[in-house]
């Protein structure tokens, strides 16, 4: 073998090695923060509209037109702090080492052609698998308003993904706040329920078990929510069963944080009213 042939052969080996490294150890998908997700989702909400709330509100052009026509808005509402009420917000901001878990998997479950199309009979079991969680929607079903309010007040956030990939992350925080984290993995369930100070801001959390495929960023329902038939609470979690009925109280007129063995549980679903209820928000920091 002459010198030139050796160089070509060596170069070929190097190329093959690089190819194998890249394909067998692909670059991890860069994790996106809740703040970045909120900014992306509400990028079209640029029209400020006066209101009687303690927060500024922004709408899309389409929703302003619909509002003027007395039609229901379609694009949610973006909430921001008001420069005129900064002193008020100081009473609502977190005062200890607290983390909130944004339910990105639950958002995916409620998406079009997702789990709920199967539950309603509009789709077969294909709607229970390969459901993408790459573009979460900050809607009522995924605690969209609650997420916004807590985020702008300065609460720290992680997502379901962070907990599933690194369950020990919760050990870094004194208090863990759950939203409508209805669909979780077994690893998530174990890590969350092992924590000593939980605040459940939503009934129906930790209800059904999913499996996550990080190669294509999708989820699949394993069991729970009457799948297969007869399996409602996938984890037989007594706390969820105790508070499940409160899921349908979205006015929270008689709200109360009820003490459980490792924290507190709210007795209503606050996402439709939390932006009106500063007393409830203030109570969170004291638990």
Would you name each region that the model predicts?
Residues 1, 22-24, 276:
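Intrinsic-disorder/low-complexity regions
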Residues 1-16:
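N-terminal Sec-pathway targeting helices
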Residues 13-19, 97-99:
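Transmembrane alpha-helices
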Residues 18-40:
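Membrane-interface motif at the C-terminal end of an N-terminal transmembrane signal
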Residues 32-168, 227, 233, 238-241, ...:
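Aromatic-Pro/Gly-enriched surface loop or interdomain linker
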Residues 136-212:
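Helical hinge/lid and interdomain linker segments adjacent to catalytic or ligand-binding clefts
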Residues 183-263:
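A glycine-rich, often tryptophan-bearing local segment used as a flexible ligand/cofactor-contacting loop or short
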């Amino acid at each position: 073998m002459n010198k030139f042939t050796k160089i070509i052969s060596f170069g070929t080996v190097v190329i093959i090695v690089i190819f194998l490294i890249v394909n067998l150890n692909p670059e991890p998908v860069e994790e996106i923060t809740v703040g970045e997700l909120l900014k992306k989702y509400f990028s079209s909400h640029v029209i400020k509209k006066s209101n009687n709330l303690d927060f500024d509100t922004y709408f899309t052009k389409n929703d302003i037109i619909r509002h003027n026509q007395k039609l229901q808005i379609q694009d949610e509402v973006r909430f921001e702090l008001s420069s005129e009420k900064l002193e008020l917000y100081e009473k609502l901001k977190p005062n200890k080492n607290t983390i909130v878990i944004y339910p990105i998997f639950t958002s995916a479950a409620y998406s079009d052609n997702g789990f709920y199309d199967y539950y309603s009979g509009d789709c077969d079991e294909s709607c229970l698998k390969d459901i993408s969680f790459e573009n979460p929607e900050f809607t009522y079903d995924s605690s969209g308003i609650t997420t916004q309010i807590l985020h702008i007040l300065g609460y720290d956030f992680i997502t379901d993904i962070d907990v599933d990939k690194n369950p020990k992350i919760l050990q870094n925080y004194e208090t863990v706040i759950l939203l409508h984290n209805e669909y979780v993995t077994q690893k998530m369930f174990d890590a969350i329920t092992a924590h000593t100070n939980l605040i459940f801001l939503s009934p129906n959390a930790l209800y059904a078990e999913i499996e996550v495929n990080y190669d294509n960023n999708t989820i699949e329902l394993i069991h729970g929510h009457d799948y297969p038939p007869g399996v409602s609470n996938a984890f037989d979690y007594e706390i969820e069963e105790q508070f499940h009925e409160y899921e349908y109280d979205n006015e929270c007129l008689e709200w109360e944080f009820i003490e459980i063995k490792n924290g507190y549980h709210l007795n209503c679903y606050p996402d439709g009213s939390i932006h009106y209820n500063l007393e409830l928000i203030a109570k969170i920091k004291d638990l």
